[in-house]
Amino acid sequence: MLSPKRTRFRKQHRGKLKGISYRGNHICFGRYALQALEPAWLTSRQIEAGRRAMTRNARRGGKIWVRIFPDKPVTVRPAETRMGSGKGCPEYWVAVVKPGRILYEMGGVTKKIARRAFSIAASKMPIRTQFIISEIE
C-alpha cells in the first residue's frame, strides 16, 4: 500500500472538496488515461486494487503510471469511546481527488486492451470516471 515515508505533522484537518482539479488533469506519460469525474477521497487500498487489476489485465504488455498518491492521513477514534479527549489516531491514507484529475495512465498497448483494463480499474473506484486518449502522438 502507498503511504508517505515521513510527514511534518501526524494529523490533518479534513478540508473541503470544492472546485475542479487544475493540476494533474492532462496526460503526461502514456497514451491512454482514466480521469475522475467526481470529487472523493481515494484510499491507498483502492488505488492499489485499481493498479493490480490493470496490471493483471494488460498482462506483460505496456506500462502503467499511477498519477495520484495518498498523502492525507485519516484519523479514526476507537469504537465505543466517549466524546472529547482529543483527535483519533491516524488509521489510513487517502489521496484527495477532484473532478478532472488523472488517476492512471497507460502506454504501449492497444486501445482495446487499455479500455478493458481501465474499465476493470474503474469498477474498483468509488467515483465515476472516464477513459481518455491523448491527442498528441
Curated annotation (Swiss-Prot):
Highest rank taxon of the organism: Eukaryota
Parts of the chain that traverse the membrane: none
Ribosomal protein keyword on record: yes
Primary subcellular site in the record, as a coarse category: plastid
Any GO MF annotation of the entry: structural constituent of ribosome
Cellular component GO terms, alphabetical: mitochondrial large ribosomal subunit; plastid
InterPro entries: Ribosomal_uL16, Ribosomal_uL16_bact-type, Ribosomal_uL16_CS, Ribosomal_uL16_dom, Ribosomal_uL16_sf
GO BP, one annotated term: mitochondrial translation
PROSITE patterns recorded: RIBOSOMAL_L16_1, RIBOSOMAL_L16_2
Compartment(s) where it occurs, according to its Swiss-Prot or TrEMBL record: Plastid
Pfam family, one: Ribosomal_L16
Residues making up the signal peptide according to the UniProt record: none
UniProt keyword annotations, A-Z: Plastid, Ribonucleoprotein, Ribosomal protein
The keyword Cytoplasm appears for this protein: no
Subunit organization: Part of the 50S ribosomal subunit.
Family: Belongs to the universal ribosomal protein uL16 family.
Name of the protein in question: Large ribosomal subunit protein uL16c
Organism name: Cuscuta exaltata (Tall dodder)
